[in-house]
């Protein structure tokens, strides 16, 4: 017997010579002497007649921070054919599925993935599901989830400005982006829509960062698009902003400035210009001071029941306070009968005559900014 590597000479011929035999367990080699055992193993895996399985996906299951312009790839254990059967996405995203190799399919979106959304991909299984070319199907439907990255504050501001919710314009500096990139920041510049805007308002603006102007504009957008007015840019907000029919505002941009300098007064600006000035008001007394700051109106009621405790410990219950625009906790612009106005008398609200409150109320919807200073 002669052993040459994995080749064994073992047969004694009848003539007294040796015959060459090759062990059946000897591996074969591919080009360059490389073993093709791994290739055969992969081929066996893809050609097996057992159930079809999902072996990989991109994004991976439970991935987070996925870019809004990402595609989706699914890899199977064997060659597959779509034959009109495709995975589904929830929430739905428009696009098409196509084969990219014998064992892989890819989703090409024609719209961006909605920021902040958790997307679920479901691959149909069973007899009516996606089938391998060898006839096998997934035993059951297979699903995986991934989280889309949060939307960017700068892009939120750009979109709100283009829909006229901000007191600024946004002018893009390049061509329109591909539709799948519309959730991403675009190059361009902001500019104030009116040169007469008061510095109390313009000083609040910071590009790319959350601020009172952006929060008020977002609440106005939510109101007009029938969403919860919580000033949070969640999935429904981004879905509406990036959808086919976001509702722009056609009204004026209004802003309220309350001065606690005696005599206390209110000015309402429309599109940068003072529309109503020196409206006499009352703010909170010393033990219930109306807080300084800028706040968006979050509740807008023709009549409101107000219940609380006065600074002296007595309780009040006013069932029908007219023309209330709440802007900071329990503080609201509203009408209230007083003998006179122009100095602190309230429990924290900004009071004015009922006639003045009725005149201003239609101009202070949810999202209107109210600045209190002095």
Question: Could you say what each language-model-derived stretch is?
Answer:
Residues 171-187, 201-215, 230-237, 256-259:
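A glycine-rich, coil/turn loop motif that links secondary-structure elements
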Residues 77, 81, 127-136, 158-166, ...:
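Sec-exported extracytoplasmic/periplasmic mature domains
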Residues 47-51, 141-161, 244-258, 289-292:
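Low-complexity, Pro/Ser/Thr- and charge-rich linker/hinge segments at domain boundaries
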Residues 72, 119, 123-126, 152-159, ...:
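Stable alpha-helical elements in mature extracytoplasmic
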Residues 67-71, 92, 100-104, 118, ...:
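Extracytoplasmic
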Residues 251, 289-292, 305-374:
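Exported/periplasmic cell-wall-interacting domains
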Residues 2-5, 9-11, 15-155, 168-174, ...:
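Acidic, low-complexity Ser/Thr/Gly/Pro-rich repeat segments typical of extracellular/periplasmic
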Residues 223-231, 235-292:
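Cell wall/extracellular polymer interaction/catalysis modules
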């Amino acid at each position: 017997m002669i052993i040459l590597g994995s080749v064994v000479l073992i047969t004694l011929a009848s003539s007294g010579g040796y015959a060459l035999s090759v062990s059946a367990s000897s591996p074969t080699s591919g080009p360059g002497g490389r073993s093709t055992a791994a290739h055969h193993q992969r081929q066996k895996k893809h050609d097996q007649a057992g159930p079809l399985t999902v072996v990989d996906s991109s994004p991976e299951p439970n991935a987070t921070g996925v870019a809004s312009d990402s595609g989706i790839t699914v890899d199977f254990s064997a060659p597959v054919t779509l034959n009109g059967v495709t995975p589904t996405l929830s929430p739905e995203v428009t696009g098409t599925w196509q084969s990219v190799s014998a064992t892989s399919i890819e989703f090409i979106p024609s719209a961006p993935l909605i920021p902040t959304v958790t997307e679920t991909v479901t691959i149909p299984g069973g007899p009516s599901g996606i089938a391998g070319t060898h006839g096998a199907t997934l035993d059951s439907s297979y699903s995986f989830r991934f989280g889309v990255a949060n939307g960017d504050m700068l892009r939120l501001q750009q979109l709100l400005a283009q829909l006229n919710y901000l007191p600024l314009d946004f002018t893009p500096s390049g061509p329109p982006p591909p539709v799948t990139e519309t959730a991403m920041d675009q190059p361009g510049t902001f500019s104030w829509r009116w040169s007469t805007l008061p510095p109390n308002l313009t000083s609040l603006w910071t590009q790319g960062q959350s601020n009172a102007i952006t929060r008020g504009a977002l609440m106005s957008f939510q109101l007009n698009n029938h969403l919860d007015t919580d000033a949070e840019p969640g999935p429904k907000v981004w879905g509406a902003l990036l959808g086919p029919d976001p509702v722009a505002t056609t009204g004026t941009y209004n802003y309220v400035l309350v001065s606690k300098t005696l005599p206390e007064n209110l000015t309402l600006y429309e599109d940068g210009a003072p529309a109503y000035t020196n409206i006499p008001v009352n703010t909170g007394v010393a033990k219930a001071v109306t807080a300084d700051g800028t706040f968006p109106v979050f509740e807008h009621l023709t009549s409101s029941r107000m219940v609380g405790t006065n600074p002296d410990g007595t309780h009040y219950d006013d069932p029908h306070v007219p023309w209330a625009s709440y802007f900071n906790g329990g503080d609201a612009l509203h009408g209230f009968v007083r003998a006179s106005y122009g100095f602190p008398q309230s429990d924290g609200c900004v009071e004015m005559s009922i006639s003045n409150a009725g005149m201003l109320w239609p101009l202070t919807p949810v999202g209107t900014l109210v600045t209190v200073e002095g």
